[in-house]
């Protein structure tokens, strides 16, 4: 099938008037949310990767519910999450002097990896260079196979980290923490946890974990997000989300995604974001027919992948010496947060689409964001970027109407950019067509497929490539759990009037609780680097709060929290730099920026408190390092029992 016998009749031709992007938020609902079409999506909450039925122990990945042994019911430090973030927190704590027995990780997944555990769709890979994204490469002596490795390799690396530091014995999988409550008498957190199984006939179990310290290491890319799809119960075909891929239906496996069972199938994909950009070319290779439903075009740049040459690795990457990975990460950060390229006295080590996209610093913050000419310069270089992108699409996609629909004309800081090698070429295939629904989305699902306007598209399979539920900026809501601090005050209550933190990792009234930003903390495109700097800082705080006297052998309880003055001062320092993100207000309500996520109901002063550190990641890291060098724990109240 061609892109369409009359592409112009499909692309932007619906009788419905285009709707504003602001309507998008109301139509998006998280799985398990009140507006989810539960009857068809209930399978999305199960774990498709569990296979064994043996009785599990801590660290196992089986699917039978269990009661944890007594040793797991108390922990010095509870880490919620066992993806790259949780692993980094655990490793940095061990390196700071804590023992394995001090640490307990819990995760709702059946294994290590976080988003790389859940996501195993065809074409999955990192779009940040693997040499800087995969954590602890220096310590594990691992050499990634490619510049951008597959999801399978990313998950294997998580398991490698866990094995090296023996974290499997101190991890509870298939365990969900739903509530954290502070006990001010015992100076500890009481975590309500439940273990579960995919076997619905078996009941899960509920228990408590008492922890002296708690760290929220939940990532943002683990909970699938789906549109509120009218008519979903009428559809009789197969439907699943990319984060719960069904290889039994498509054929293939995560390691070898040869989807030979789709050769006679009509497949539809909803979405054209980062996930869709990776999965669409793979589906196009195998599906009999592929129809892509696009609400707004993705901002897709070119990604050139290559095998890692070991001689090059030795002579170029490791040549930087000790801490080479951190240096490479910080070189990357410098190039993506500085449109003033001539001022950078350094070589671009990563040399990819990210480092050629410095206007994205509008969304990340940077040392130059507060300069008077910054926005004009950002707009100028972003215009050049868009023109180059449009030329690439026009020269690649043969059908002019399709090429026009695939071009994203918005500023480069309003959407997270996507990168791929071969995405646009996919639309030249005879079995692929694009259905552009400008700013509106599909009309409804029918018994046989998808309706857009007055046209029905018959489909055997619908793949939801609709991303992940980011949640609110409140750490409790982002982690999808209830947190009550001193006086039973909920974190959501405190966040309602705008956050106050120390360094973006602690907040008063919630002692011994830590979280990795993003409000009032530094941010960058490389989330692993963000987690690592937070882990380094938090490990220092917990370790140095322990008493150093001989009497400390009895391990007295300790309460750590910011002083009221210190967290308010840090909040005001953040507010004073919030103008660095002023240009994000040019983005529509459907964008992923903080301004768009908070919405118009939040006033300017509150919004400024929610912003990241406006001077960028390098400035933020330097402030944390200088704070630690003073060794006085300034701004923290430390009380021993």
Curated annotation (Swiss-Prot):
Q: Where is the composition biased (Polar residues)?
A: 48-65
Annotated residues that bind NADP(+) are located at 125-127, 272-278, 295-296
Q: GO molecular function, one example?
A: monooxygenase activity
The pathway is: Secondary metabolite biosynthesis; terpenoid biosynthesis
Q: One Pfam annotation, family name? A: Pyr_redox_2
Annotated binding of FAD, by residue: 115-118, 127-128, 133
GO terms of biological process kind: paraherquonin biosynthetic process
From the UniProt record, list the reaction(s) this protein catalyses: protoaustinoid B + AH2 + O2 = preaustinoid A + A + H2O
Question: Which keywords appear in this protein's UniProt record, sorted alphabetically?
Answer: FAD, Flavoprotein, NADP, Oxidoreductase
Q: How is the cofactor bound?
A: Binds 1 FAD per subunit.
> Where in this protein does the record put region Disordered?
1-69
Q: What family name appears in the similarity comment?
A: Belongs to the FAD-binding monooxygenase family.
Q: What does this protein do?
A: FAD-binding monooxygenase; part of the gene cluster that mediates the biosynthesis of paraherquonin, a meroterpenoid with a unique, highly congested hexacyclic molecular architecture. The first step of the pathway is the synthesis of 3,5-dimethylorsellinic acid (DMOA) by the polyketide synthase prhL.
The identity of this protein, by name, is FAD-binding monooxygenase prhJ
Instruction: State the organism of origin.
Output: Penicillium brasilianum
**Originating gene:** prhJ
